[in-house]
């Protein structure tokens, strides 16, 4: 976690953590949507940069991993009677995506950097939430 804390410019506010704990169904729905979006982004990059073998390999691995996580979260939701719905993107992710540059080379770099920030933030948040979640969610 030290590397993640050094990478992120600030910690998630405790108010976000309290709100997430108070509404765990939305937390799970949002997490499933984030996993799906990450997989879709990886697949989109595979289409756009199909002549880049290294990128194809990494994005293929990422898409599979994110879809597996999506499936796992949706299963947890189903076990808890939580209906999957699509939520609008968070302001955090939307704000980061809004600064992605348009020229092709810069756009790829920006998309990868934004993805790294979103993934790091997710890790940071779940590390803080985990001790306060039930056993099944802690293991996930």
Question: Predicted segment positions?
Answer:
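Non-heme di-metal
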Residues: 1-140
């Amino acid at each position: 976690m030290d590397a993640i804390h050094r990478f992120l410019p600030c910690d998630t506010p405790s108010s976000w953590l309290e709100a997430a704990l108070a509404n765990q169904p939305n937390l799970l729905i949002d997490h499933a949507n984030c996993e799906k979006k990450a997989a879709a982004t990886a697949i989109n990059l595979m289409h756009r940069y199909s002549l880049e073998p290294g990128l194809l390999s990494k994005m293929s691995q990422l898409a599979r991993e994110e879809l597996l996580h999506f499936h796992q979260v949706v299963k947890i939701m189903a076990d808890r009677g939580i209906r999957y719905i699509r939520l609008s993107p968070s302001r955090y992710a939307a704000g980061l995506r809004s600064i992605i540059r348009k020229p092709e080379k810069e756009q790829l770099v920006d998309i990868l950097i934004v993805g790294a920030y979103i993934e790091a933030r997710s890790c940071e948040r779940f590390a803080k939430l985990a001790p306060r979640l039930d056993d099944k969610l802690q293991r996930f």
